[in-house]
Amino acid sequence: MSGKHPLVQAVENAQLKSDIPAFAPGDTVIVQVKVKEGDRERLQAFEGVVIAKKNRGLNSAFTVRKISSGVGVERVFQTHSPVVAKIEVKRRGDVRRAKLYYLRELSGKAARIREKLPARKRG
């Protein structure tokens, strides 16, 4: 049970996006971000590994990390923000943690994440 006023909850539910794919920490995603340059707007892709995810309704956010010219870059996106145009899951990662902050200390091949394979059918 949420402790929010029903009116606040109704307004927040109207703001929620419905076209967000299911993704988890460890997944490699491409986030299309709306960038305003002067009077024109364009989409900029930010591709990286999801290292954290916070599910809080309208306040949901996720952190994406990538290596750009040898420097680690992390960006926190608000899941339901109008700035985020599209989220595309490129690769599913198989990890045993919810927060992958340990990847900050690793570099090169040590920072690789195993790919999650589809479940085998028994029988």
Curated annotation (Swiss-Prot):
Q: Which UniProt keywords apply?
A: Ribonucleoprotein, Ribosomal protein
UniProt record, GO biological process: translation
What InterPro entries does the database record attribute to this sequence? Ribosomal_bL19, Ribosomal_bL19_CS, Ribosomal_bL19_sf, Translation_prot_SH3-like_sf
One GO cellular component term noted in the UniProt record for this chain: cytosolic large ribosomal subunit
Does the record carry Ribonucleoprotein as a key word?
A: yes
PANTHER family for the chain = LARGE RIBOSOMAL SUBUNIT PROTEIN BL19M (PTHR15680:SF9), RIBOSOMAL PROTEIN L19 (PTHR15680)
Please give the function described in this protein's UniProt entry.
This protein is located at the 30S-50S ribosomal subunit interface and may play a role in the structure and function of the aminoacyl-tRNA binding site.
Q: Which family does it belong to?
A: Belongs to the bacterial ribosomal protein bL19 family.
> What is the name attached to this protein's record?
Large ribosomal subunit protein bL19
Q: Which organism is it from?
A: Acinetobacter baylyi (strain ATCC 33305 / BD413 / ADP1)
